[in-house]
Amino acid sequence: MLEEAQKVIDKIRELTDEVILFHSASGKDSIVLCDMLSKSFRKVVCVYMYVVKGMESQEMYMRYAKTKYPNVTFMQVPHYAWYSYAKYGYMGCVPRPQMKKYTLAELTDIARGKTGIEWAFFGFKQSDSLNRRVMLRTYEDEAINYKTKKVYPLSKYKNRDCMEYIKKMSLIHPETTENCNKTQSSGVAISDLDYLLFLRSRFPQDLKLIINEYPLVERLLYEYDFNQTQPTK
């Protein structure tokens, strides 16, 4: 299962015994890669990018990984979207016009500087979007960029492949909303109504954390609740 992904990982293992993994905490791709990398490398530093820090719905996944894999550690940094949100006052957060915006590439370099680790792994798949498909197909094995030292082992796989691996290996199930079958963006989708309803039902303290930082999010729920009381036309 995921044999091509393992071959990609094995190639990098010949070059280093420690890697960075950009880990979304509750996402299926991250759960799969964390399991695979922990078995191949001496040290795996997972970088979790948050939009709201301290959400239990995400922290529980990080605790799971640290407990299950002794060679896995986590560092948390603001998500690149957080800098943009802060700069422009998205969803009512306190605007910080002087805030510098960061790209994922820049955050990767910051993580490298803090850890001293060069090779970075990501859960990107060609099936995610056209842009990712075009990008990934330019790399060796459609997965390895030796120039930037970035690796995408799941490039050729689909969501169902990751879910099958999770089931077969009896890993923790990724976060899924109650209103749909899609897995969410692990604490990033703060304006997604399904995600907000999921938090209200399962992790109300996390919802409070989001509203404290992005107060206009509460209006989305207010409008939803109001519409639920209106007669169907």
What is the predicted function of each stretch?
Residues 1-233:
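Nucleotide-activated chemistry modules centered on ATP-dependent adenylation/adenylyltransferase
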